[in-house]
């Protein structure tokens, strides 16, 4: 079986970050982009795509590029903004696919796209839970505690449980496995994200 070519971005990481900042000023949105970038980089290495870590990371970093300025056209304005910034069609497809079934009809096919689809909403849930905990950190967080928050529909109500469940199904993972891996990814990157956010 012929090996698929490695996915690479024509952008450097600095260029991708500048592109995000061009359209996003809200510290919350910037933190979310940096968090999802770090989580995607962790998953790339964890799942055997280490040679594509930069690509996975940039897709995570830029996945909500249009949300701050165009919330009603989320994932619909992104292709234009990304194309103007020099992004490849492959990167654009990866970014847009995370909105499948909610704001676009671009389905996530590659494992990277499925991870983004699953982890995007889940990072928000984990972050909300972390803010409640001692030290406002994911450090020491356990799956059992996150499960309770997941079942409480009033907690972080903006984080779609249905999307998280569908994401796990698309990956062929148990929900518990997705929780465990994403918690570990956020724990591993928390310090770097905090520093990038000036904390």
Where in this protein do the model-derived segments appear?
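Electropositive phosphate-/nucleotide-binding environments in soluble metabolic enzymes
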Residues: 10-14, 30-34, 72, 109, ...
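Acidic/His-rich, divalent-metal-binding segments that scaffold phosphate/diphosphate chemistry
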Residues: 2-70
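A structured, mid-to-C-terminal "fold-capping" secondary-structure block
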Residues: 138-139, 145-199
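Divalent metal-dependent catalytic cores for phosphoryl transfer on phosphate-bearing substrates
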Residues: 49-155
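A generic alpha-helix surface/boundary motif
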Residues: 14, 34-38, 75-77, 126, ...
